Amino acid sequence: MSSRPKEAPRDYSTISPSALSLLLMKSGSSIAFAKQAAALLWNDSVPDELAHAMTEENARRRLRHFENRYLSLDRLLFHAGCPNVLEIGSGLSFRGLELTRTTPTHYVDTDLPALAALKAELVTRLHPGPLAGTLRVQALDALDSQAFQSTVAALPDGPVAIANEGLLVYLNEREKAQLAANVHAALTARGGRWLTADVYLKNPGGSAPTVGYGRSRAFIDAHRIEQNKFSDWSAAERFFVDAGFEVVDKLAHAHPLHVRESWALAVRR
């Protein structure tokens, strides 16, 4: 009997340039530290770079989309009220810095090594003073079960909110299932919530997603972003239920096509 060939390891670092382009775009929003971080990276060229980005088709609508997505995860974190937060695939979002600046939260902010190193440097420059909480920026492959559980085990006692936005659309079914298993094991041991702003549906009628902010058509196709979305709301809920979760809260994104929601999930007992 022939064995099924193993899949070649994916190079997830190819996703990282999207985080840089999103930071530039978010510098035109109210998102905490986005403008200051962009200025550290692009210096005086930020206004010109942002102005150029905003000339793209549907730019302002997409800016609202990403700002709303960010704020929806903030709301879910507030409602969850967990003393510990693990954010996975956080990119160049500085939610952890803002939350630990203002609250006694213990926050572990993670992404792939290059992005985590860049963010750690930016955090030091953005807020060199003491924080109300504790912020740790570190590298983590969220699909690595052992590394995931070790990261959670290093958190102080108490329930954990595991948060993500902009991650699931880069993962295929097998990878999403592995991530869900890692989160489920962590929350079974510690209690808490999985908070995801990534419940995206495929574009209606098979229409192509909008290209912009450094995401070329080749980038979108190479990462199979459209294929990685859920086919409908029932399919999305079925995925999480099959992984051992129940949906305890939903925040709908105000959009005429209604293609994204943010969900809070608990381990099904």
Question: Which residues does each PLM region occupy?
Answer:
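Core SAM-dependent methyltransferase catalytic element
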Residues: 253-269
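Short alpha-helix
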Residues: 226-244
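Short, glycine-/aromatic-enriched active-site segment of Class I SAM-dependent methyltransferases
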Residues: 208-226
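Short amphipathic alpha-helix with an adjacent loop that forms part of the alpha/beta core around
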Residues: 146-156
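Rossmann-like AdoMet
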Residues: 1-86, 90-138, 156
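A short, conserved alpha-helix within the catalytic core of class I
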Residues: 147-148, 170-183
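A short SAM/SAH-binding and catalytic strip from SAM-dependent methyltransferases
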Residues: 159-175
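Conserved beta-strand signature within the Rossmann-like core of class I S-adenosyl-L-methionine
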Residues: 161, 180, 187-202
